Amino acid sequence: MLKQFLLLQSFSFFLFNVVIVGGRTFGGGFSAEENPFTPKASLVRYWNKEIRGQSPRSEFLISKASPLNAVDSATFSKLAAANSLPTRFPDFCSAANLFCFPDLGASLEKHDDDVKFSVYDQKNFTNYGNARAGGADSFKNYSKDGNVVTDSFRRYSRNAAGHDDKFTVYGENSNVVEEGFNSYGTFGTGGAGDFTNYQNNVNNPTSRFTAYSDGGNGRSQTFKTYTHEANAGNGQSFTSYGKNGNGVPNEFTSYGVSSNVIGSGFSNYGESGNAANDTFTSYGSDGNVPQNNFNNYGASGNAAVDTFANYRDKANVGDDSFSSYAKDSNSEKVNFVNYGQSFNPGSETFTGYGKGAEGSKLSFKTYTPNSTFKDYAKKGVAFAKYNVSTTTANTVGDGKTVNKWIEPGKFFRESSLKEGTVIPMPDIKDKMPKRSFLPRSIITKLPFSTSKLGEIKRIFHAVENSTMGGIITDAVTECERPPSVGETKRCVGSAEDMIDFATSVLGRSVVLRTTENVAGSKEKVVIGKVNGINGGKLTKAVSCHQSLYPYLLYYCHSVPKVRVYEADLLELNSKKKINHGIAICHMDTSSWGPSHGAFLALGSKPGRIEVCHWIFENDMNWAIAD
């Protein structure tokens, strides 16, 4: 009896202790926040086990742990083991705080009157505006300032006559945007489609125009200020755009201007069309590495006129491919004026351009000096000021060439890290969707290799040729890229994996640091107190940078010969502390490419200078504890 009493007393004492630690109780004496079986609690224990006691625990890293509760974590782990996660994908995405596109179902909504959509978001338009006579629909401030934006327009304005569509400030200032236009304006007569300020200032924009204005008669499309100042997306794909059209004018003005790594693909564009009139003005100008592909563009067309003016002008590098352009066409006129005069030389490839054409006139004026012509029409081509190299770069007082695409302050010299120095601060704000790590119990059951891309896409509901499919492919491919000279790298999707990688390189006595906030971004700041990590000596370090992926994924790597600093950042006029930044200086740049942005900005060559940069918001730096 006494023994049973003592056992009961011990058990009661155990429960009491758990309640005291947990605070509010639920289901057995644990709180929702402190349940020891949650992924977050597991991560805390893992940190305490793997990192030596004198190293401060990083609440920053702990905050990125999976928000799944104990029950959901166990449930989704079992589903992952059984390859059944897709059956609960919406629930999994929401509960685990993942980055996912919504599954848009078909909509049969119709309308007979003019419609104005203002401050609208996330909609599927199917069979919308079909066979309408006259009228106009206006999309203004649509999907603006969103995070993950997905819109679908299918069979919109099909067989309509004189029907106008206006997309103004559409998808602006959003992050990861995907819009699909299928069979839009097909067989329409007259009317106009106007895209103005479309997907401007967007991170990772994607638009797909399939069978857009196919078989249209006199229906014009205008794209103005389209993907202006956008960043790193697949861009736009135009498939069978204006195919079999009659007198269809299309105008692209300020398209992709000042954008970063944006691509466009034109496939079967204007094919078999009659009297098409396409104008590309200031297309891809001032951009960074724009890539555009024209495949089977204007093939078998009749009396078409295409004009490329100030195309990819003052851009940095960039590549264009023209395959079977104006092939087998009749009386086609193509004018390239001031084409491809990029800041740094890009390349153009013309394969089968104008081949088999009759009575066509192709004119090149002030064209790029770096082009390849294969199976090119020999007759009817005029080259004026061809292969003339123009200097469009800006120069500063010391004669160094400065590329406008290298943001001031993105790269700097070690000598700038001195108290009192005024330095431009780049935009260090994290522009990726907010996500969390997955717990190790789930991530170890998910595929992650290029050989299993199909399975990965199935899990995350990424259909073929979708934006999400491209995001997944890009991330996995980059993670499998062989390391550069002297680099040790690993992609991690759980905090435990990051801890393992950092400690494998640096040992178990480590400190995790990140820049405190984003104050001072895109402004001039004053360097305050500076502290060199590990005495400011050459040291080892591990830097982890976010990769875009459904769950929180970091590309972690260690390179030799670096110095790491932490510095107070002061407001320019008041000298008040506004931030505490972490900077890393690469002392050996000999293996870097000569076209690296650091050398364009600082005016040097690989191996001749050290290069420093800040650790951006939500990126991390691991160093050996002092």
Swiss-Prot record:
- Native organism taxonomy: Eukaryota, Viridiplantae, Streptophyta, Embryophyta, Tracheophyta
* Assigned GO CC terms: apoplast; plant-type cell wall
BURP domain segment(s): 411-625
Top-rank lineage group of the source organism: Eukaryota
One GO biological process from the UniProt record?
Answer: plant-type cell wall modification
Does DNA-binding appear among the keywords?
no
**What are the subcellular locations of this protein?**
Secreted, Extracellular space, Apoplast; Secreted, Cell wall
Keyword set for this entry? Apoplast, Cell wall, Glycoprotein, Repeat, Secreted, Signal
Q: Which SMART domains match?
A: BURP (SM01045)
The entry's other comment says: Unlike the tomato GP1, the BURP domain of AtPGL3 is not cleaved when the protein is secreted to the cell wall.
Against PROSITE patterns, the record matches this protein to: BURP
**Chief location of this protein within or outside the cell:** secreted
* FXXY repeat ranges, renumbered to this chain: 117-120, 125-128, 139-142, 153-156, 167-170, 181-184, 195-198, 209-212, 223-226, 238-241, 252-255, 266-269, 280-283, 294-297, 308-311, 322-325, 336-339, 350-353, 364-367, 373-376, 383-386
According to its record, what is known about the domains?
Answer: The BURP domain located at the C-terminus has not been identified in non-plant proteins. It is critical for PGL3's role in cell growth.
Question: Would you indicate the residue range of the signal peptide?
Answer: 1-23
Q: Which InterPro entries match?
A: BURP_dom, PG-associated_BURP
Tell me the null mutant phenotype. Answer: Slightly reduced size of the plant. Atpgl1, atpgl2 and atpgl3 triple mutants produce smaller leaves and petioles.
> What's the protein name?
Polygalacturonase 1 beta-like protein 3
Tissue expression notes: Expressed in flowers and stems. Detected in trichomes, guard cells, root vascular tissue, root hairs, pollen sacs, sepals and styles of pistils.
